[in-house]
Amino acid sequence: DTFAAMALPSLPPDRSVLSEPPRDPNSHIVDRRMMRRIVATGLLFFLFLAALWQYMFHMPIESVSEMFTADSVKVFFADIFKPKTTLHLSGYEMGIYFSIFVLMQFWNLFNVKYFRTHHSLIGDIIDLFRNPERVKASYNKYFLLIAAVIIVGQVIIVTFAGSLFNVEPISAEDWGLIILLTSPVLIIPDLYRFISGLRSKQR
């Protein structure tokens, strides 16, 4: 969160703001729509991470792929509320859990970046070939650098500083699966933004 809070203010101003009507000086900076988004996102993250935590205490995990086997899913729904659990998570399990948490926050960084901008990451990737100047104007090197630091820093922490965080290094395969598992945090909202942007242009 600290690095994300540093990355977002580094973004250049959006010129489209000049086309919007002035904000009511008596209105709150965090309006109802923004508050609903914050609460909904926080609640979804909490429920997912709480369920994952409970699941790991009932089912020993040695790789991310084990979480999606038929037996694992059966255990999740059959034993999730039973009091019998392991005494603690292993260092490898903690590494998986910690990395999932950080990657979810990383993807959400882009959701915050595109909030109320009428743009999307998918649209920006397409515009890299059609209108690269617009895309470059919406980013800067500091944002990209901090985003890279978050990812590289997480890999370094889990791989080389595990004893400080009670985690163990995880495999390259598990890193790939964690990226895929957490990417819907960005992909689903971004698809909605992209489709909404196309519809608004057609009006």
Predicted regions and their residues:
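C-terminal transmembrane helices and immediately adjacent loops/tails
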Residues: 2-203
